[in-house]
Amino acid sequence: MSRDRSSLFKKSRRLGFSVLENEKEFNKGKKRNYAPGQHGQRRTKLSDYGLHLYEKQKVKNLYGVNERQFANSFKKSSKLKGVQGTNFLQFLEQRLDNLVYRAGFAETRRQARQFVNHGHVLVDGKKVDIPSYRVAVGKVIEIKEKLQKNAQVLRNKEIRTAADWLSVKDFKATFTRLPERNEFLKEVNDSLIVEFYNK
C-alpha cells in the first residue's frame, strides 16, 4: 500500500493545524501562523472548491488514510441510514488503528497504526494486523502482553484519557457505542466533505 512520506511538519503547516493533534510536529521549529513558502504570508482566500477540498484533506490527514481508502469509506458509509456526514466520520472512527489511539494506548494514530501493523493488537482475542479493520460495537481490543511492558505504552496510558465510547480496563478496551457527532472532531465541517463527493 502506498504511503504519504511527506514531512508531517510541512503537511500540518500547510493545512494550518496539527495532524498529530498534539502539536508535536511543531516542536523542532516555531509554529508559524502563515502558509509555507517564500510568499506564505500572502495566503489567498480559498474558492468554494478549495474550501471543500481543504476540509476533505484535513480529515484524510487526521486519520492517516490515503485517497482510495478515504473515498471507499465514504462510499460504504453512504449506504447507511442516518445523517451522511455523521455516518462517514463514525465509519472512520471504527478503524482499528483509530480505536487503539482513542483508547489511549498510543500517543498518535500513526503510532497506533504501527502497533497494529506489527501484530501487537488483538480483537476479541484474535490478532488483527490491518489498521483499516472496521471494529463493530461490542468488540474488545487488547494490547498483546509483550507490548504492555513497553515504556512508551505505559506512559501513554498515564497521560492520555480514553474516549467516552470506550470502556478501558488495564490493556483492554471495549467499544461500547458509536460516538455522538458532538463528541469528536467538532472543528470539522463534515457537510463540506459530503458536498465534495456528491457534486
From Swiss-Prot:
InterPro entries: Ribosomal_uS4, Ribosomal_uS4_bac-type, Ribosomal_uS4_CS, Ribosomal_uS4_N, S4_RNA-bd, S4_RNA-bd_sf
S4 RNA-binding domain residues: 94-157
Record key words, sorted: Ribonucleoprotein, Ribosomal protein, RNA-binding, rRNA-binding
Claim: Ligase is one of the keywords in the record: no
Single GO cellular component term: small ribosomal subunit
GO biological process terms, semicolon-separated: ribosomal small subunit biogenesis; translation
GO molecular function term, any single one: structural constituent of ribosome
Pfam families named in the record: Ribosomal_S4, S4
S-S pairs: none
CDD domains with a match to the protein in the record: S4
Superkingdom, natural source: Bacteria
Family annotation (NCBIfam families): PRK05327.1, rpsD_bact
Function: One of the primary rRNA binding proteins, it binds directly to 16S rRNA where it nucleates assembly of the body of the 30S subunit.
Family listed: Belongs to the universal ribosomal protein uS4 family.
Quaternary state and interactors: Part of the 30S ribosomal subunit. Contacts protein S5. The interaction surface between S4 and S5 is involved in control of translational fidelity.
Protein name per UniProt: Small ribosomal subunit protein uS4
Species in which this protein is naturally found: Mycoplasmopsis pulmonis (strain UAB CTIP) (Mycoplasma pulmonis)
Gene (UniProt): rpsD
